[in-house]
């Protein structure tokens, strides 16, 4: 607030009436809060009739200088106070449009990053579900593979047993062929023996016939031989047919077994080929699923690292903004404290100025109206002032002329 109307602008004249005379005995005490200003100015009997004392002039000059310096300091403090109030108003006006948009931008960035993090989490969840599905599919394929492998092992065991049976049948066939050969050889031996016996019998019968021609009637040996030959031939034919029928039956059975075994072998081989193809396809698909899982895990790791770095950057940005906000708040607190200090200084200066005003007004009322008069100081006009105050003059009362 301005103080131009509160105190008079003091100036000292060159005459004797421009300065009050303060005796040395009046400097004993000072006013509280008024730096070394005499408190008993005008209360002691220091009126003179002619001239002023040099100490009184110096005291008035000191008071005028102090008052001028205080007024200048008050004006400077008023200017600084006005500047601080303008700065505070500008800061209060600029605080909302400056801080809020910045925080809104940060909030938008944080929301975008949160949306990205949520999208990344959903993508990670989807990838985890896909990985679980791939694991379930791989487990299913592994179960199928183990089942097919067990079936393959069973089929291979059956094929091995059928191969053993085929080997046994081959051995039986070779044994039967050997038996047929031996029977053929035996048949040839029997034929040879039969021929030898027939020849022997013929020889014997021929001798007997010659002997018995004279003794007995003749016997038809050809018929007997033919009958014997027919009997043996019928027996040989019967044995041959039985052997041929048995051989044919065994051969047909073996052929049937071989055909069925070959069909089973072909079907087993086809199944084995199909199982091998299925196993290869499953292995390829399993390898693809493993590669997909590895790629998804790598993508997940990269996403986590990227989002963690972005989150750390956002945290650093938030920390910086919070530190700036703390600095701004500390600056505002410091300015408020300075403002309070200035207000306290202002109040003290106002008290001191009021003290000066009261002191000057009281002294103005106590000084005589005509310090140069010898009889009545208040009724007669003021005399002319001496141009040279240092010249010795008659002693008179103090001059109470102030220029407002």
Curated annotation (Swiss-Prot):
The keyword Coiled coil applies. There are two types of hair/microfibrillar keratin, I (acidic) and II (neutral to basic). Residues 92-102 are annotated as: Linker 1. Belongs to the intermediate filament family. Residues 364-404 are annotated as: Tail. This is Keratin, type I cuticular Ha3-I. The gene is Krt33a. Residues 220-363 are annotated as: Coil 2. The keyword RNA-binding does not apply.
């Amino acid at each position: 607030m301005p103080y131009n109307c509160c105190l008079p602008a003091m100036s000292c004249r060159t005459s004797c009436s421009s300065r009050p005379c303060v005796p040395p005995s009046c400097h004993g005490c000072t006013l509280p809060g008024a730096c070394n200003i005499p408190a008993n100015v005008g209360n002691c009997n220091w009126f003179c009739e002619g001239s002023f004392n040099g100490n009184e002039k110096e005291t008035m000059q000191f008071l005028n200088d102090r008052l001028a310096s205080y007024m200048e300091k008050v004006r400077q403090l008023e200017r600084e106070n006005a500047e601080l109030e303008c700065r505070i108003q500008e800061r209060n006006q600029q605080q909302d449009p400056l801080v809020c948009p910045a925080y809104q931008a940060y909030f938008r960035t944080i929301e975008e990053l949160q949306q990205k993090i949520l999208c990344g989490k959903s993508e990670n969840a989807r990838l985890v579900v896909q990985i679980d599905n791939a694991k379930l599919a791989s487990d299913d394929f592994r179960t199928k593979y183990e089942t097919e492998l067990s079936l393959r092992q069973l089929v291979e065991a059956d094929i091995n047993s059928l191969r053993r049976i085929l080997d046994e049948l081959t051995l039986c066939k070779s044994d039967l062929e050997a038996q047929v050969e031996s029977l053929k050889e035996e048949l040839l031996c029997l034929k040879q023996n039969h021929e030898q016996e027939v020849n022997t019998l013929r020889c014997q019968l021929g001798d007997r016939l010659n002997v018995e021609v004279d003794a007995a009637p003749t016997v038809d040996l050809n018929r007997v031989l033919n009958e014997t030959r027919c009997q043996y031939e019928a027996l040989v034919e019967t044995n041959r047919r039985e052997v041929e029928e048995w051989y044919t039956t065994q051969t047909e059975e073996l052929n049937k077994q071989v055909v069925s075994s070959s069909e089973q072998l072909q079907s087993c081989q086809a199944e084995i080929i199909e199982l091998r193809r299925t196993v290869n396809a499953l292995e390829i698909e399993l390898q693809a699923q493993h590669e997909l899982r590895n790629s998804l895990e790598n993508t997940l790791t990269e996403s986590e690292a990227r989002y963690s770095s972005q989150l750390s950057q956002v945290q650093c940005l938030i920390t910086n903004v919070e530190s700036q906000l703390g600095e701004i708040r500390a600056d505002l607190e410091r300015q408020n404290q300075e403002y309070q200090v200035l207000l306290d200084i202002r109040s003290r200066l106002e008290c001191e100025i009021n003290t000066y005003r009261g002191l000057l007004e009281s002294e103005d009322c106590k000084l005589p109206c005509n310090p140069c008069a010898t009889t009545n100081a208040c009724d007669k006009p003021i005399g002319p002032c001496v141009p040279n105050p240092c010249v010795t003059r008659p002693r008179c009362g103090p001059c109470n002329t102030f220029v407002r």
